[in-house]
Amino acid sequence: MKNVNNRELGRQGERIAREYLSEKCGYTIIGSNYYASHKEIDIIALDGEYIVFVEVKCRTKTERPSHRPGRAVGFAKRKNIIEAANRFIFENCDLDFVAGKRSRVDVVEVVVPPMDHRFNDNSGELKLSACSINHIRNAFYSDGTLR
C-alpha cells in the first residue's frame, strides 16, 4: 500500500467529499478549488435553492478524537471563505445556476481510517466507504461566527 503525504491526503479527502455530496446528498457539483486572490473554496455545489460553498477538512483517525477536523476552520479561514464566496457570486451573478439562489457554507469532515483499510486494492485511491464523514450544513453565519 502506498503512503500519502498531507497534500495528497487533502486532495483525496476533497475527492471523497465531492463523491459523498453528489452520491449521498444529491448535490450537483459545479466547481472545485476556486480561488479569489489567495482565498480558496474547496467545492462549489447546488443543493435545491442554495448555492453551497464547501470547506473540506481531512484527518486521519489516529489523531486525537477531540481534534475534530472542522475545528481547523478558524475565524480567519471562515472570513476568507465568505470573501471568496461573495466574489464567486459577484463574478457569476448573471448565470442561471447562480441567479436567485440563496447561499450557505457547509463544512465536510473526512476522517480516514488506518492505512490497511484506506485504499481500493493497491490503486492508492481512498474509498468513500472506508471513511467517516461528518457534514455540517450551514456551518457559520455570513460574519464568520459559528452557528
Which residues make up each language-model segment?
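Catalytic cores of nucleic-acid endonucleases
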Residues: 58-114
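Conserved catalytic cores of phosphodiester-cleaving nucleases, focusing on short active-site segments
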Residues: 17, 21, 43-62, 81
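Residues at secondary-structure transition points
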Residues: 4, 8, 12, 38, ...
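Acidic-basic catalytic patches of nuclease active cores, encompassing PD-(D/E)XK
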Residues: 1-33
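Glycine-rich, flexible loop/turn motifs
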Residues: 30, 69, 132, 136
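Domain-level recognition of nuclease-like catalytic cores that cleave nucleotide substrates
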Residues: 92-147
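Active-site metal-binding core of divalent-cation-utilizing nuclease and nuclease-like domains
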Residues: 28-51
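Acidic-residue sensor for enzyme active/binding pockets
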Residues: 14, 40, 55, 109
